[in-house]
Amino acid sequence: MSSPNRGEVWLVDLGYVAKVRPCLVISIPAWDIDRALATIIPHTTSSRRSRFEVDIKTHFLRSGVFDVQNIITIPHAKLLRNLGSLTTEQMTEVEKIMLLWLGFKDASAEEGMG
């Protein structure tokens, strides 16, 4: 299998408890010398209305959110099927929340969020 690309949404086997669900790839493609891993953000239809959830509308996803607080890294073998890709604008929206969650952006500067 070729390496997944940043911005692609894949159906991923997250195990018995977390189920098979769509996930957004946020890592860059792995090279042959790299471990075959992808960093992803799971999509959920059960929103908690957290400021770290990103609501993205696409034709290939049910209504729901990407839960940035659940960023994980998985082996490529868990990637089942490519569902589609987010637009540049949608990725920018996810990246903004991801930078806030990871502490690369000051939360006090984000007063309008929530």
Predicted feature locations:
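Conserved functional hotspots at enzyme active or ligand-binding sites that engage polyanionic ligands
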Residues: 1-114
